[in-house]
Amino acid sequence: MYEIEKYVNVNIGGTALLLDLLTNTPHTVRRVVVAESRAIYGEGRYWSDDLNTYVYPLERPDETMARGDFEVKYPECTKPLRLVATTEDSAIHPNSVYGITKQVQGQLVHLVCKSIGVESVSFRYQNVYGPGQSLSNPYTGILSIFSTRIKNGNGINVFEDGRETRDFVYIDDVADATILGLEAEGVSGHAFNIGTGVATDVLTVANTLKKYYGIDVPVTVSGNYRLGDIRHNFADISQARR
């Protein structure tokens, strides 16, 4: 849950302050681009062969993960769920405080901007990586954290079974997309996933970085886990490509 008050004050309070200024003071702002997050999707979208439809699993329970069973489950389904790309019209069901604040942030921007005649666009960034990323926050910057440990000759601790996946997108691509969000026509009121559309597991990330740096450090798949972490999620980016 990690720094609850900070998430609420910055993401919701800061956005409310901005919208107050846009509503109550003279300005020349034409469009607001809000940085949402893939966290609003929670576990993301899956296909159920049992139900023959898309399903949206809830948070994985502690007792299940404690047994080393890390895959998501869904009531009434006996067959394994199949991970599919998460589209912008997928269910919004964040399973973290951070995700809830990003959901509210986006809703505030679209609601208020529409009422005051300002255009709005929201970008749902996937796992962004690149220079300048924090090394102290375990919920972001896994590539930076792993890279630093490898270059210092330290081993890497991979949580769960290492097969959890994320959609990793480079910061320059995110910056380019954000600029397009400011300039493109006909996008007001819409939300776009910003990612690569590729699911990469964490163990592959660790081994790829070792190979890139040419430094052999031990990679330990520990089975440790954090409640509230998602198992998988990757974006459908077809809307952003149009």
Predicted features along the sequence, with ranges:
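A conserved pocket-lining segment of Rossmann-fold NAD(P)-dependent short-chain dehydrogenase/reductase
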Residues: 74-96, 118-134, 145-169, 193
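C-terminal substrate-binding subdomain of Rossmann-fold SDR/epimerase-dehydratase oxidoreductases
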Residues: 150-242
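Residue-level signal for the nucleotide or nucleotide-sugar donor/cofactor binding architecture
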Residues: 2, 10-13, 89, 96, ...
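Gly/Ser/Thr-rich beta-alpha loop segments that engage phosphate groups in nucleotides
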Residues: 16, 44, 101, 132-134, ...
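Short aromatic-enriched loop/helix-cap "lid" or pocket-rim segments at secondary-structure transitions
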Residues: 43-48, 133-137, 205-207, 231-233
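Glycine-rich, phosphate-binding/catalytic loops in enzymes
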Residues: 6, 48-53, 139-141, 175, ...
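Conserved active-site helix of classical SDR/Rossmann-fold NAD(P)-dependent CH-OH oxidoreductases
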Residues: 15-16, 103-110, 143-147, 176, ...
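N-terminal Rossmann-like NAD(P)+-binding domain of SDR-like oxidoreductases, especially those catalyzing
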Residues: 1-126
